[in-house]
Amino acid sequence: MVIRKYISIITLNVNGLNAPTKRHRLAEWIQKQGPYICCLQETHFRPMDTYRLKLRGWKKIFHANGNQKKAGVAIRISDKIAFKTKAITRDKEGHYIIINGSIQEEDKQL
């Protein structure tokens, strides 16, 4: 694991990820950008659909989804960074998610 002095974060409003082609293109783009953290808005997933967020090299995936196919947010944290999760706060309607944790023993909130 490489230790850097900065954390690269990208955030995207994806306006729905139910189409396989869109998920594939997004995965390729994320891999090309190489961020440590990726925040996604408007995933439009139902709770049962979140398996679609899986991506090689990104084992930590946190999400908040409503019961309908609208809203939805997700935060992916790359395996390249040693993030230790302490607490997660989710909106049951899928509008926000807050993750408290630490990186190299320094507290962070995403």
Regions found by a protein language model. Name each.
Residues 1-110:
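Short phosphate/oxyanion-binding micro-motifs
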